[in-house]
């Protein structure tokens, strides 16, 4: 698993967001926006 910052993690199969950490990077809403569409249940 690799951590990309702003709560974003990726492994060989998928990427996901830790929203607790993502909330600390509120200035990076563009990143969270395009990742958010690919994350079920968020």
UniProtKB/Swiss-Prot annotation:
Main subcellular location of this protein, as a coarse class: secreted
Domain of life: Bacteria
GO biological process: defense response to bacterium; killing of cells of another organism
Subcellular location: Secreted
PROSITE patterns, A to Z: BACTERIOCIN_IIA
Family annotation (InterPro entries): Bacteriocin_IIa, Bacteriocin_IIa_CS, Bacteriocin_IIa_dom_sf
The entry's keywords: Antibiotic, Antimicrobial, Bacteriocin, Disulfide bond, Secreted
This protein's name: Bacteriocin bavaricin-MN
Organism listed in the record: Latilactobacillus sakei
